[in-house]
Amino acid sequence: MSSFYNEAKFLISDGEQMRIDTYAVGRKTMQQSDAFKGTFYENFTLVYALPLSNHDNSSLMLIAGFYALLFMFGTCGNAAILAVVHHVKGQDPRSRHNTTLTYICILSIVDFLSMLPIPMTIIDQILGFWMFDTFACKLFRLLEHIGKIFSTFILVAFSIDRYCAVCHPLQVRVRNQRTVFVFLGIMFFVTCVMLSPILLYAHSKELVMHEKVDLDQEVITRMHLYKCVDDLGRELFVVFTLYSFVLAYLMPLLFMIYFYYEMLIRLFKQANVIKQTLVGRRSGGEEKKLTIPVGHIAIYTLAICSFHFICWTPYWISILYSLYEELYQDTKSTASPPTYAFIYFMYGVHALPYINSASNFILYGLLNRQLHNAPERKYTRNGVGGRQMSHALTTNTRPEYSELIAIPSSSCRPDSRVSAMIHNNNNNTESLPLAQNISNMTNKDSATIVPMPMSANVDGNEIYNWITPDTESVIL
């Protein structure tokens, strides 16, 4: 098949001329096309033309510029979080077993990958057609939907991890690295199964916009373009949309609300118990520093759920609207084309998931106390003048949820609750009744555990070691 590239003019049926320049215009004879063999047009020459680009559309260029800013903001931000996590793990060996940092790291990787399709989206917006092949189309759809599904699954796992850290602090196996990676592997497998129809059917599809036949010159001029489409078919599209809505939006949203709500309820109860325990032992200013910042945690948690809800709800409403049109389009006698305002509005709606992926690193990374305070903890654990500070039983366990046991940093493994209790029994005889009470309670439901009252033999100065400024690190 021979082809050439030149400037051409495309004649619209009403006589209006549309200039086709800077684009390829291919030509081939009908003798080389199986579609017209044995027909009247068998010896006609077929000329292909591409439509004009949208570079002169100022509104669309503004949208493309906004997408470009999202791409730079999201990729740079998530890459910066990955660099910070790598630095923190290098400075503090204990953080290598930190499940919170693991979730933040995986979330940043997924959000970074979900930003990669944005340049292809911008090119498609400006040109008005898909300029890449089918393989690029499949890769584009895969990265786009991974950010929409797998990223949401990670946020749910993150909420479960924080819930377990607060409400079930003694369940160590639930929050170790092996369990986290098994959980992430299962979620990734479920994501791949959900996206299998996209991988099978997504391709670059040719769309013929207009065709004109010149009988005198025996030429057929066809204006066409390519679009990256899922092409699932009506039945499969309905099934795919419904189970994606339920599994990737509705259930994750309900899970996040439930686990964060239960976590806040437990924090309010624990804060009241700790406040009653510390009454009269310290001055008002010092006592305020030792309380749990429940209000700050509640605002932060509400911001997480609200931001996720705001970004994803309009998108899924638009998806359900397209599903409604797919199911009931046969009952419509006439279908008017969408207005420009509606098109621009839909561009904004579909930009919201990208905004969510580009901004997750702020809520889950920059606002996380473990990333903020990790360099400080490295130098403050040794203290001034060689004084060692105590830390919680595990990297992520808040001291007040570890029954207020003070554990020296160099005594035992920081991730071993059993060794911590043994150490307190052997070396701190004054706290023996407290340790025995905790040992007797380990077989009970951790949801019923509350801080035990301090005995009269316990030095009040140790409160600063039991409740440090890092007490909210697992939450924030």
From Swiss-Prot:
- Xref: Pfam families: 7tm_1 (PF00001)
Q: Which residues are glycosylated?
A: N43, N57
Where is it made, tissue-wise?
Expressed in sensory neurons including ASER.
Cytoplasmic membrane side: 83-102, 161-179, 258-291, 356-476
Name the domain of life.
Eukaryota
**Family annotation (InterPro entries):** GPCR_Rhodpsn, GPCR_Rhodpsn_7TM
Mind listing the GO molecular function terms for this protein?
G protein-coupled receptor activity
Which coarse location class describes where this protein primarily resides? membrane
Please describe what happens when the gene is knocked out.
Defective octopamine signaling characterized by reduced octopamine inhibition of the aversive response initiated by ASH sensory neurons when exposed to 100% 1-octanol. RNAi-mediated knockdown results in an inability to distinguish between different food odors.
Q: How does it sit in the membrane?
A: Multi-pass membrane protein
A single GO CC term for this protein reads: plasma membrane
Question: Transmembrane segments in this chain: where?
Answer: 62-82, 103-123, 140-160, 180-200, 237-257, 292-312, 335-355
Taken from the record's topology, the Extracellular segments are 1-61, 124-139, 201-236, 313-334
Give the UniProt keywords, A-Z: Cell membrane, Disulfide bond, G-protein coupled receptor, Glycoprotein, Membrane, Receptor, Transducer, Transmembrane, Transmembrane helix
**Where can this protein be found?**
Cell membrane
Coiled coil region boundaries:
none
Which residues are connected by disulfide bridges in this protein? C137-C228
Q: Which family does it belong to?
A: Belongs to the G-protein coupled receptor 1 family.
Q: Briefly, what is this protein's role?
A: Probable receptor for neuropeptide ligand nlp-9 that plays a role in octopamine signaling and specifically, the octapamine inhibition of aversion responses in olfactory sensory neurons. In AWB olfactory sensory neurons, required for the detection of preferred food sources.
Q: Which protein, by its recorded name, is this? A: Neuropeptide receptor 18
Biological source species:
Caenorhabditis elegans
Highest lineage ranks of the organism? Eukaryota, Metazoa, Ecdysozoa, Nematoda, Chromadorea
